[in-house]
Amino acid sequence: MSELSTLARPYAEAVFRMAQDENDLAGWSSRVTTLATIVSDTQVARLIADPAVPADRVAELIVSVAGDGLGERGANFVKVLSANDRLTLLPEISTQFETLKAGAEGTLEATITSAQELSQAQVDDLVAGLKAKFQRAVNVQVAVDPELIGGAVIMIGDQVIDGSVKGRLQRMAFALQG
């Protein structure tokens, strides 16, 4: 995962700088997210991985599927990624772009993963606590993972707050072993 992160970083930073220069962070966010969704499709992923399909054909297909909203600079971005065999990095590029965008906007991105579905009131309480702790606005994505058994794990910035039963059990097992 860190290799993908390392490879994607210069592309994410380049797109971010371009978006800032154009004063269009929201537009580029939408474009990069769309491209990440397209390359995540199983059929497109197979085409990208097929050495018999020329890189320029794959780029043309992706630009075509993305539509007019991509624009000339977006199409050029796809062509650069394709020529450098980096199309598969688009989901990670999108993630890093969103992190850079949130930083520029003064917000933090957080993912709350709980063992069970959270009510809106519970999510609002967690967001209020995170805002108070970090003194910044927080954008939240919520996910459910029954393997946590109970509680929740919050990933915000480069921090992880593990309040799950699974995490507590793992920490107890580690303490008993050491």
From Swiss-Prot:
It is a peripheral membrane protein. Keywords: ATP synthesis, Cell inner membrane, Cell membrane, CF(1), Hydrogen ion transport, Ion transport, Membrane, Transport. It is found in: Cell inner membrane. Disulfide bonds: none annotated. Gene3D superfamilies: N-terminal domain of the delta subunit of the F1F0-ATP synthase. GO terms for cellular component: plasma membrane; proton-transporting ATP synthase complex. GO terms for molecular function: proton-transporting ATP synthase activity, rotational mechanism. Its main location: membrane. F-type ATPases have 2 components, F(1) - the catalytic core - and F(0) - the membrane proton channel. F(1) has five subunits: alpha(3), beta(3), gamma(1), delta(1), epsilon(1). F(0) has three main subunits: a(1), b(2) and c(10-14). The alpha and beta chains form an alternating ring which encloses part of the gamma chain. F(1) is attached to F(0) by a central stalk formed by the gamma and epsilon chains, while a peripheral stalk is formed by the delta and b chains. F(1)F(0) ATP synthase produces ATP from ADP in the presence of a proton or sodium gradient. F-type ATPases consist of two structural domains, F(1) containing the extramembraneous catalytic core and F(0) containing the membrane proton channel, linked together by a central stalk and a peripheral stalk. During catalysis, ATP synthesis in the catalytic domain of F(1) is coupled via a rotary mechanism of the central stalk subunits to proton translocation. This protein is part of the stalk that links CF(0) to CF(1). It either transmits conformational changes from CF(0) to CF(1) or is implicated in proton conduction. Belongs to the ATPase delta chain family. This is ATP synthase subunit delta. It comes from Thiobacillus denitrificans (strain ATCC 25259 / T1).
